[in-house]
Amino acid sequence: MTTPIIVTGTDTGVGKTVFSAALAGALEATYWKPVQAGLDEETDRLAVLRLSGLPETRLLAEAYRLTTPASPHLAAEIDGVAIDPEALVLPDTQGPLVVEGAGGLLVPLTRHVTYIDVFATWRAPVVLCARTTLGTINHTLLSIEALRARAIPLLGIAFIGDENAESERIIVELGRARRLGRLPHLAQLTTDALRAAFARNFNTADFLKETA
């Protein structure tokens, strides 16, 4: 039976892919990135393969692979590809399934559909990755409101970066959300270092609890 967990973020570059690799590895999950925009450098799927410690068979192929590193709606138009949001259906897997979005919740997949629209049809629990730097309070609370407005279950907040206790506290308090933990920046980003950091700062059981 599939147990899906969606990993999204407050912004692009927040650290979703590294966190997804850590989570997928800790849960021995299957990983899926529905849409990859940008193929010149290491793709998110390949980064997760490198960092998670999972066999390649646990990493599903992307539904859409787009050449240009841009918003999926634009990257698809440049490539002459039509993304069909209704075709993005959660794969049937055994055990946990970690699904990584792109950018933030309102990143457009097409001219009319955003990621959060697809998440709303899935109704799977969401882990919201948030920075700890200046500006994160507003960005994170807005993202929480967007999820709640669409009745999308929020599993909790995974903070990424240096410790910022007050920002983390006020986000959890005002957002009425669960703090899952904080993944620090790592001097050496390796499979072993990432696995150890995740184990120190997160409890894998929290990702299988009921949502807030």
UniProtKB/Swiss-Prot annotation:
Active site: 33
Listed GO biological process terms: biotin biosynthetic process
Involved pathway(s): Cofactor biosynthesis; biotin biosynthesis; biotin from 7,8-diaminononanoate: step 1/2
GO MF annotation list: ATP binding; dethiobiotin synthase activity; magnesium ion binding
Chain positions recorded as ATP binding sites: 13-18, 100-103, 184-186
Major place of residence: cytoplasm
Keyword terms: ATP-binding, Biotin biosynthesis, Cytoplasm, Ligase, Magnesium, Metal-binding, Nucleotide-binding
Catalytic activity of the protein: (7R,8S)-7,8-diammoniononanoate + CO2 + ATP = (4R,5S)-dethiobiotin + ADP + phosphate + 3 H(+)
Record-linked Gene3D superfamilies: P-loop containing nucleotide triphosphate hydrolases (3.40.50.300)
UniProt: Mg(2+) binding residues: 17, 100
Subunit structure: Homodimer.
Protein's name according to its UniProt entry: ATP-dependent dethiobiotin synthetase BioD
Annotated organism of origin: Rhodopseudomonas palustris (strain BisB5)
Taxonomic lineage: Bacteria, Pseudomonadati, Pseudomonadota, Alphaproteobacteria, Hyphomicrobiales
Gene name per UniProt: bioD
